[in-house]
Every structure is written in C-alpha cells, then in structure tokens.
Amino acid sequence: MQSIFNNKYQFKNIETKYNTLWDTTKLYKWKNSGTNQFVIDTPPPTISGQLHIGHVFSYCHTDFIARYQRMLGKDVFYPIGFDDNGLPTERLVEKTKKIRATDISRKEFKTICTQVSHEFRIQFKQLFQSIGISYDWDLEYHTISKDIQKISQTSFINLYNKGKLYRKLQPIFWDCIDKTAIARAEVEENELSSFMNTIAFSTEAGKAINIATTRPELMPACVAVFFNPSDIRYQDLLGQNAIVPIFGNKVKILSDDQVKIDKGTGLVMCCTFGDEMDVYWWNKHNLDTKIIISKSGTIDHLNTLQGQDVCKQLHGLSITEARALIIEILERNNLLIQKQEITHNVKCAERSGAPIEILLSHQWFIKVVDIKHELLKQVQKINWHPQSMRKQIEIWIEGLNWDWCISRQRYFGVPFPVWYSKDGKIILPDINKLPIDPTNDLPEGYQDTEIEVETDVMDTWATSSLSTQFHNISATPADLRAQSHEIIRSWAFYTILQAYYHNNDIPWKNIMISGWCLAEDKTKMSKSKGNVLTPNKLLDEYGADVVRYWTANSKLGADTTFSNEILKLGKRFTTKLWNASKFVSMFIDQYSEPDLQYITETMDKWILSKLYKVIVKATESFNSFEYCIALDCIESFFWKDFCDNYLELSKKRAYGELISKQEHLSAVNTLSFVLRELLKMLAPFMPYVTEEIYRTLYSSNNSIHSHNTWPAADVNLYNESDELLGETFIEILNQVRKVKASAQLSVKYKINKLIINKHFPVSLENDLKAVCNADCIVYDNRQNDNKEQLLVSVEFENVQIT
C-alpha cells in the first residue's frame, strides 16, 4: 500500500492515468435523471485564438462548483460548447491564413473557417482535459453546427412573429476596418490623442461665431448648430442661420438643453453623424441627413453649395486624411482660431480597435429600449455572486438608448432565414425546414429571379445567448451561469433578454462572475503587450492541481494578478498533503473504513470538532459560490490544526508506544477519518492528487469525485467541552514552542519539567508530554495571580524559562 508514497508525487503520470480513467468510465456523464439535478449554463469559449492562462482562471472557477455539486449527489449537467462562428473567428482565420475574406469566394472562405475552427476546438479540448475540467463531453456543441443554427433561426422567426424583432434603415455603429455593423455592447471607449479645433463660422447676418470640434472633416455633413437655452451669449441667435465655412451651407441655429455650456465655445455643430448626441438631436429636431462617410471609411457623397474644388480633393480620402486636409485649408484661409492638443475618450470597435462611425444602414434589430423596466425586474430575480456585479448590468440597462443590432455584414455565421421579394416583402421559411441558407436555398413558391437574398449573418451573441436552449432539459431556469465580468453587458444581458422574450422567465437562478487574470504588471493580458502566459508551460512545470490551486486563490468577481508565489505555495501544499498522507498510511489498513466508535481521546475529539466547523464553513461557502473562502478555511485547518498540531501530538499514540490499545485505535481511526474528509473537501480544487491518495488508501474501485462523497456536517462530530480543552492544550503547546524558539532550541529538545498554573485533565497528559517532549508536568497555582490567564514555564536541566 505504501509503495506509491516511496517517491515524490509524480503529477504528470498521475494526470495522464486519471484523465484516461475518467474519460473511459464516463465519470462526469449527465444521467438525465430528471431529479436532483444541477444545471450549469457553461460559457462557450470563442474560437478567436489560443487560450491563455486567463481562460483557465475563469473556467476552473466553474469546475470547482460542478465538482462540489456532483459530490453532493447532484446529477450535474455540465456541457462544453465552442462559439466557433462570427467576426472573432473570421479575424482569426484572416490572421492565421494570411487571407482576406473579400479576396476569395464566400464559399471558399467559409470552408477555411470551418477547418480552422475544428483545429482550434481540438486544442481547446486538450487544454480543458489537461487542467481537469469535468465536462460531460457527450454534451459538446458548436454554435455553427446545423442543430444550433436551427435553434438560432427558430428564435429569429419566433421573435419576428411576436413583433420583438424588426428591420429598419436607421443610424448604426459601423466598424470601417471589419466593414460591418456592430452592437452597442461591442463599442468600448479608448483614450486617444487629438486636437480641439476652434473654427470661425458666421451667421447669415454676418455675425462671427466660433465652434470647437475634434472632427472638422464632418463640416460638409453639418445640419444644425446648437447652444444651451440658458446660455445668454447665444440666445439672440435662436432661429437664425449659420454659414458653414468653406462649404457655404446654411444650417439652423437651435437650442437644446443637452449642450454643455462650459465645453468648447458653448456652440456645437450637429453633423450626421459624429456621435450619439448627433443622432439624438437629429431625431428630436427632425433634421436633414447628410452622410459623407462610406462603409469603407472614406469621404463620399459630398453635396455642398460652395467649395467644389475642396470636395473633389476630399473625395476618396480616409477620415484622418480628410481631417488633415480640412485643417490645412482652414489655416490657409485664416478660419482656424485655435488648435489645442487634447486626450479624450473615443468610442472604438471592440475587436478591431478602430474608432467607430455612425452610418445609416438597413439592419436587423431586437427590441430592447421599450422593455428596459421589465429587464431590470428580471435582473433582480437572479442571485448575483458577488452581489455588487448586479449593479453593472443595471447601469448598462438604464443607459441603453439603442436596440440590439444583430446583423453583421460578414460571412461565417448563422444565416438570417430571410429572403426579400422584389417589392420589399420579407419572406420567411417554414420552421420545419430550418436550418436554411438563403444564399443556397430558395423560398417555397419562388424562383431565384423573383427574390433578393439576405447575405448578412447574425451576431454570434444572438446565437450563444440561447445557450440554455441548446439541450432539451426540463430543469429551467438553470441553476448557474458562470462567466467573467467583461461580458455582463453582452452574454449575460442578451441571455436574460432572450429568456424573457421566449419563456417570460429568467434563464438561471444564479450567476457567478469571475474577474480577470491580470499580468504581473497588473494590466490586462494582451498579445500586443507581450504579457500573455500560456497555460501549457505552467501545467508542464507545476501540474494541474497547483495551477487550479492558484486559480482558487482569487476572490469571486475580483481581478487577480498572476503570481508565481502562489504557484509555489500550491506546490508546497501538494507536497505536504502527499507527505501527510504517507504518514497516515503507515498506521491504517488499506481500504478499511475508519470507525468513529473507537475515537475516545480528548485531542482526537478536539480535531473532530475542528473538522466539523470546517465542513460547515466549506459547505456554506460552496453553496454561496465562494470557492476562495472554502479553500481558505480547508487549507488553514490542514496546515495549522491537522499538520502542525494534531499529527505531532498523536504520533506517539499512532505508533502505539507505551499506551493502551484503546488510545492507539482512537488515534489511528481519527487520522484515517480526518485525512479522508480533508481529501474530499480538497477534491474540487485538486482532483488528481486527492484521487490518487483516496484510491490508494480508501477505495480502489470508487472515485473521490463520485456522487455523494462530500463530507457530511454530522453534529455528532462536535463537542464543545472537548474543543475548549483542546484549545487550552494547543495554547500550552504554542507557549512551549515559543519558549524553545526564543532559546534557539529544537522543538524536540527535551523538557525536564513543564510547569502550568492551571490543572489539566490527566487524560491529556500523555499527549502533552509527548508533543512537548517533557518528562513530567507540574501544576503550580502559586503563579496564578490572574485566574483567567494561562501561564506556562519550562525547565531545561534545572534552568527554568517562562
């Protein structure tokens, strides 16, 4: 039995052995029992590049909960999917294959995307298995598969029929790099350098007025000038016309309370469209439309009263080129009053990083703005872990003023099940015919000459937000959604929206939010910064259990800096667990069940009382998804109570030296029981080392990760008086250790006489003498001036130290 402990823990061999065993025995298979289930809505990783340590960080957090729930006896539904369509995957393909989607046929590009997605899915699966994620791989899904496309297209048609989805020509966010519309959730603000340019305008009556702008290239698209109605400087201008310099266009001067008096000159030009405020004014005041930026991000469609030569020069220029030319012309004509360098927040596309433009375009939208109040109610029905994360989504919903644009002008995605007749009628297929691809299929009763094909594809979130519908399970809402905080406004929000529209319900009872894994410089890991850590290197050096230990040392929802020091602590912890198990294995019979009826000694009952409290705390923490707190209390008990104290004080009785059989059996059964329960509590975090020890000492046929293996918080384990006596014992031991340390003596150094000011039960004297290495214990009440204070003196060869 002890042969495995003759060597150091060889994690590589152990991991290979158990990955094979768990896979072949289908240990984590969902039984679809219909009762006592725990359903997890797993985040499907996006096929957008190599997984880094940050992905391992968050995916392990979910696995802790899945393993715990399985050990509770639950039938755990824990699928894995891959979000292998959409813009992120296309960008990966273009980068890795050094091609552009526009340079080859649509069919050829989609074929290449399919091949690349398959290759990356294999890599992802290997990583997840190597880190010990306990997915049921029989539940694997791909968002580009025919089955998922059918679900997504069915959702689209149902929402359309309910009036929750529409197609309309309206302003949208446009990414000029990827040449596609994007949703508000895909827009982020980046701090960029720019110039605030103060430009000389005039009124039609000839009065000089100045307007400051960072986007002078939009002057040909100016449709109005605004001031705040409370700004007395400009109240006399209301209703007059302003003349746009260079181009000569006349635009109305209007007032609106959204103008910031203290920004720029207090006058602002409204262009179609420079930002969201322009859209707001355009709608509110029913302004004209002048779109001068093409979908490629160049200047186009210029139509001005004057400056035709300038228009010709601007035509076809990029936005930055046009801006520079306009500034040059303004300076040349003494129309540039001031040019001030600034840094400001600019809305950029999340994927490409390019500043977004707002263009008019026909797109598909899911209604959001009209039901914000209802969505906030849904959010409040869900238990958020940590609770503070709920505020993020509430702020997001409250600030929404755009519906969700779900159409993308891309290629590798779920097709819209839509055709258009020549007169613009929307044609939908029979749901029973789904999935369809309108670029290949025809609607029933139509010829190809009678229709126009919808070539756009759906936003990948429009599909992945239906993840709770991907498998036909009766348990709804799901018990848990686990995800990171940066996709609260996308994946979490969209899933809540879809569940409300389709089921009038919440998608899950609980949502557990992980933070980011930050680089050692405390910044977000990024390939461009060169601070990304690859999991395989860490797994090769430390092993899966140690890496998982590191991921568990993060507060729920908090960003955590990567730390080699915590990995080293994890390695030390694994080694100590192995060695402690080796020690216990010396005294117990292999596969024998520890018998609590043999546990009679006070210090054995003390460690059981401490164990009981740890089981209660760990169980409560896991039930509230606080895996970090669970690990902390288990680890503290292991190091301080079990290893530092109990193993030392029970050694003599475990070896059976000069004691009764009863004392020996009490120690041996306690060691066996406490170690077994410790292994069980550590199993969700460190599945490999705990499995190896458990199968070696306790059960060769049953896995520690099987159902109903979580320790029971049996109140019979706890005895308050034994706990208090034990704490006094430990206090004496700590004082003795302190005395020896201050005298620079070994902890094993013999004590001639241990003097205590309080009477101590005789039943504990043997353990106390053994652990302190004391010849005798003397009770001296004369030094007991303070009745409450415990005083300990130690005598070494007639030298007494207090």
Curated annotation (Swiss-Prot):
Q: Does the keyword Ligase apply?
A: yes
Q: Which GO terms describe its biological process?
A: valyl-tRNA aminoacylation
Q: Where are the transmembrane segments?
A: none
Which residues are recorded as binding ATP? 527
Q: Mainly localized where?
A: cytoplasm
Q: How does it assemble?
A: Monomer.
Family named by the database record? Belongs to the class-I aminoacyl-tRNA synthetase family. ValS type 2 subfamily.
Quote the protein name from its UniProt record. Valine--tRNA ligase
What organism does the UniProt record list as the source?
A: Ehrlichia canis (strain Jake)
